[in-house]
């Protein structure tokens, strides 16, 4: 370093940050960006600009570069690939030394990788497609407070997906009527019920009143059915201090699970809450409100697989993932790719699922995938087949829209779920024989028969906006 000299002025980024001969280290954090450069900007220069601005670079040479080892700390754009079917975009693969990031801080990683660089003039659009977190970083993160197996043990539920429901209408109910709806759903056969993401503490329903009436409903349904029940009490609030106060009260009421809107509240709040849940034996359900603002544009933003990985590191026992078959956006292959990132201990590179890197999660517990949004009993065979046992299938309108009421809707979904699981275990093809399986089960369940008739014409057949870039 003593032999370095300072040459003032502006240099092309690719002279420093484009390193095609570099072989990434096991300890490097790897990123894949989809880049659309401005007209006239070479790919190598655009990739190097992204590497520079997301690591050590600035727009001009500065003399303080001489006071550190820039060769060690810089991000390196080491590979470029074409994007199938898009002549303007390309993939830029960038390696970052681990020492650029604070241990255990997803916040710090995102501040660098999706910070100022996304407003950079050298690129027309930029999307973070995937990250490879090194195991050395993963070991510094708390991860899920409980994880899949511990949750199953706490709730004593095995061998099938869990069955849930978001209470509707999402806004406007009094606390007492809200608690009544919870009781009817749980008493009818659901395992879990849920606050919607925008229920916090509004004038029509203050949080403390809701918590008390819901706790009464959960305890009553548990006692009457002999099954362990739960309700996701949303503790999201305007301040972290208020959020923690609500979490403490849920614990005082003896409730097993709370809920958090992790994107609107932020990763700092989420990690704080996850650490508290781990120390206090509480399960943590995570809603992804605001995700589509960030991830739906296929050319600019952050792919949800990255948000899912970050959530697993930050902490959560459940995460909403879309349904593939319901009312919300979700490509099947892509969804399966990030569901694997939530649940598996090792996920290999698989471009057919949008997975750009091998990802080793070590011994970090997994996260339950939550399928929710516009689903009903006719979707049950596909949902069981797509999401498997380590999931929560949540039917909001598909429970409470039943002509017989909440309890009847819950019973219909429980019968449908158990029929599908039984058929799967017997080797039947759920997606090919699903209709027959449900109709057979409906012969002995009036509630299911009515549900099948009610929703037989309901479909959400819209093309997926954010499709995988595969040929």
Curated annotation (Swiss-Prot):
Positions bound to Mg(2+): 194, 196-197
Induction: Both mRNA and protein accumulate at 0.15% and 0.03% CO(2), but not at 15% or 2% CO(2) (at protein level).
Annotated binding of substrate, by residue: 116, 166, 170, 288, 320, 372
Catalyzed reactions per annotation: 2 (2R)-3-phosphoglycerate + 2 H(+) = D-ribulose 1,5-bisphosphate + CO2 + H2O; D-ribulose 1,5-bisphosphate + O2 = 2-phosphoglycolate + (2R)-3-phosphoglycerate + 2 H(+)
GO cellular component: carboxysome
Site (Transition state stabilizer): 327
Protein's recorded name: Ribulose bisphosphate carboxylase large chain 2
Protein's organism: Hydrogenovibrio marinus
């Amino acid at each position: 370093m003593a032999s370095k000299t300072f040459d003032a002025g502006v240099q092309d980024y690719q002279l420093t940050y484009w390193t095609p001969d570099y072989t990434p280290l096991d300890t490097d954090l790897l990123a894949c960006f989809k880049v659309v450069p401005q007209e006239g900007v070479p790919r190598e220069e655009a990739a190097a600009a992204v590497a520079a601005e997301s690591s050590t670079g600035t727009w001009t040479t500065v003399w303080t570069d001489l006071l550190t080892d820039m060769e060690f700390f810089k991000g390196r754009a080491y590979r470029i690939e074409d994007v199938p079917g898009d002549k303007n975009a390309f993939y830029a693969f960038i390696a970052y030394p681990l020492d650029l990031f604070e241990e255990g801080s997803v916040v710090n990683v995102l501040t660098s990788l999706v910070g100022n660089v996304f407003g950079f003039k050298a690129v027309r659009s930029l999307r973070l497609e995937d990250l490879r977190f090194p195991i050395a970083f993963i070991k510094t993160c708390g991860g899920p407070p409980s994880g899949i197996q511990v949750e199953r043990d706490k709730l004593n539920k095995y061998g099938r997906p869990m069955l849930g429901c978001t209470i509707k209408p999402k806004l406007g109910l009094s606390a007492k009527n809200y608690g009544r709806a919870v009781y009817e759903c749980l008493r009818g056969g659901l395992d879990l019920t849920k606050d919607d993401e925008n229920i916090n503490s509004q004038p029509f329903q203050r949080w403390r009143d809701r918590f008390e009436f819901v706790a009464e409903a959960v305890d009553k349904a548990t006692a009457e059915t002999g099954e362990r029940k739960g309700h996701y009490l949303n503790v999201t609030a305007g301040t972290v201090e208020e959020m923690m106060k609500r979490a403490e009260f849920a614990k005082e009421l003896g409730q097993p699970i709370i809920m958090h809107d992790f994107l609107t509240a932020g990763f700092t709040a989420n990690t704080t809450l996850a650490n508290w849940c781990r120390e206090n034996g509480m399960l943590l359900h995570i809603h992804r409100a605001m995700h589509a603002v960030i991830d739906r544009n296929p050319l600019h933003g952050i792919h949800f697989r990255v948000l899912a990985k970050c959530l697993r590191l930050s902490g959560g026992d459940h995460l909403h993932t879309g349904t593939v078959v319901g009312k919300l956006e979700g490509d099947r292959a892509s969804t399966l790719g990030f569901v694997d990132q939530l649940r598996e201990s090792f996920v290999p590179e698989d471009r057919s699922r949008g997975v750009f890197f091998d990802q080793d999660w070590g011994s970090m517990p997994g996260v339950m995938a939550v399928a929710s949004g516009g689903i009903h009993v006719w979707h049950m065979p596909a949902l069981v087949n797509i999401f498997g046992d380590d999931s929560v299938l949540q039917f909001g309108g598909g429970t409470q829209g039943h002509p017989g009421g909440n309890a009847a809707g819950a019973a219909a979904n429980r019968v449908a779920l158990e029929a599908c699981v039984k058929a799967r275990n017997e080797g039947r093809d759920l997606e090919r024989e699903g209709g027959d399986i449900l109709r057979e089960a409906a012969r002995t369940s009036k509630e299911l028969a009515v549900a099948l008739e009610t929703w037989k014409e309901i479909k959400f057949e819209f093309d997926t906006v954010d499709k995988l870039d595969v040929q």
